[in-house]
């Protein structure tokens, strides 16, 4: 596992965006051989999406031959609702870059057959071979996507019940009213995530410090979903300074020394 220790959320966004752009450009995608990118929603990736849009407008990257799969979507929330993940992604990213509509894949939380929707999502991912890079965030309790604590580390795309803590955390997007936050969501599984060629998790804020500690210094444990990254051959954690407050000094020093060349210029 790589840990990229930075100072601010803006630096995390810029580093992550630069990494994505470098991966896409090195891949040299074509219509017949697209780069497949997994994407999250929420507050954490906002600085990354902003940086990606800026890099696209500066001519540094094209998304014309990029295929995206989003991590999750609320169940029962209309697609046009401002807080649906469909709306979030278009508002913050898709509408500002040159990605074709047919290359965008989002789970349908209003599908008449939820099980079939989840199964078809997995099949479509497999039809591309694999996701080349899956970017995500992490919850205070260590969840990735909506894989809440005690999720199977072999799980696939499915419907999940959201914990009260997750709904409270997400209520900031719903007028701070937890009753407006859906109780269920569709989410890729931990196994789906681990199948990706590379996984990059962004970690921001002191409230994520215990989750980061569990991921880096703890044991693999289904109560801390984030710890599954220890099983992945190519995992990256990109974090700001407040999120590292629970790490041992020697752990942080170790990764600072390892990544010194990769965090220059931010």
UniProtKB/Swiss-Prot annotation:
Pfam family, any one: Glucosamine_iso
Activity control, per UniProt: Allosterically activated by N-acetylglucosamine 6-phosphate (GlcNAc6P). Competitively inhibited by 2-amino-2-deoxy-D-glucitol-6-phosphate (GlcN-ol-6P).
Outcome of swapping residue 148 to Q: Large decrease in activity
Keywords: Allosteric enzyme, Carbohydrate metabolism, Disulfide bond, Hydrolase
GO CC, any one term: cytoplasm
HAMAP family linked to this entry: GlcN6P_deamin
Similarity comment: family membership: Belongs to the glucosamine/galactosamine-6-phosphate isomerase family. NagB subfamily.
Subunit structure: Homohexamer; trimer of disulfide-linked dimers.
Name of the featured protein: Glucosamine-6-phosphate deaminase
Organism: Escherichia coli (strain K12)
């Amino acid at each position: 596992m790589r840990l990229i220790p930075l100072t601010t959320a803006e630096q995390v966004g810029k580093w992550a965006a630069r990494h994505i752009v470098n991966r896409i450009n090195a891949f040299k995608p074509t219509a017949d051989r697209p780069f497949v990118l997994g994407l999250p929603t929420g507050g954490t990736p906002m600085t990354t999406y902003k940086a990606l849009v800026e890099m696209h407008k500066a001519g540094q990257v094209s998304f014309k031959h990029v295929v995206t799969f989003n991590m999750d979507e609320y169940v029962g929330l209309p697609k046009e609702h401002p807080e649906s993940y469909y709306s979030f992604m278009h508002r913050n990213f898709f509408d500002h870059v040159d990605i074709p509509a047919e290359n965008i894949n989002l789970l349908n939380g209003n599908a008449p057959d939820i099980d079939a929707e989840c199964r078809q999502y997995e099949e479509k991912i497999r039809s591309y071979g694999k996701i080349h890079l899956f970017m995500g965030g992490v919850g205070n309790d260590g969840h990735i996507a909506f894989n809440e604590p005690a999720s199977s580390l072999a799980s696939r795309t499915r419907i999940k019940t959201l914990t009260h803590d997750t709904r409270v955390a997400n209520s900031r997007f719903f007028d701070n009213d937890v009753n407006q936050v859906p109780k269920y969501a569709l989410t890729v599984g931990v196994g789906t995530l681990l199948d990706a060629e590379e996984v990059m998790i962004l970690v921001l804020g002191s409230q994520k410090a215990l989750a980061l500690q569990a991921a880096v210094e703890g044991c693999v444990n289904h109560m801390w979903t984030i710890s599954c990254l220890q099983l992945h051959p190519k995992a990256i954690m990109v974090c700001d300074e407040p999120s590292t407050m629970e790490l041992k000094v020697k752990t942080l020093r170790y990764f600072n020394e390892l990544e010194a060349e990769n965090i220059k210029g931010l």
